């Protein structure tokens, strides 16, 4: 299993604990476990860095697994429990089949979900996007791109993840009663080669496809590549999710119409800060419905330059 343990203490580049040194082992550890390797989680890591600076008494880690499966996440969680971590925030890959494992974690550590929820588990709260609402936003962007309707295809890593199911739901709700036709939703298990193949196949099978939409961060750049390679840039519209650099470039050059961006920086920061509050006996931050919603934003040609500049400053690129 490919596994990357990313330190989130600014200036530390070696893999390992976020806070190294003679007394690192005396500090409680907090970890954010991702569901894939993507720029999205690099941004979340910057939020963890802020929390680390504010709370040097903790070790705060970003754990990126290259095996983006429920089984891979279970192994990560088991390893963290063996290491005795105090708190975990996780983007859940397969909520229906993860509940038992998550409840085991919740019995031993503070558990928060972020990005993709597991509402049936004993997690303290979910921190992230209202994904149904984000799906509706994407649906509105699709309608803008296709005022006369047309065929569309959706692409996502897996429909086992709550955020994927909810985004599809929101898109369908927004498009109900229009002339936009969803031909299918394609999954790739976060296998970039399979994702690319899915997109290429759609372009061949549906020569009249009007729009393609990637629901996870890595898919929109792959759609961008596939459409350009097929010579259909500008003909096949693209609406995506998240702020991958290639997605933003595609918006700038007019190949991509828009993208729905979340606030992964806040996902990281709020996860760490609120785990620490909970460890200290403070749960006043938990909303009544157990969901701390972070707003989304539409990025298109009108605001992409400003957004890209802010993102560059955040990432130090």
Where are these regions (language model features)?
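A residue-level marker of the well-folded mature domains of exported/periplasmic proteins
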Residues: 3, 13, 22-317
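Bacterial N-terminal signal peptides
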Residues: 8-16
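Bacterial N-terminal signal peptides that target proteins for export
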Residues: 1-8
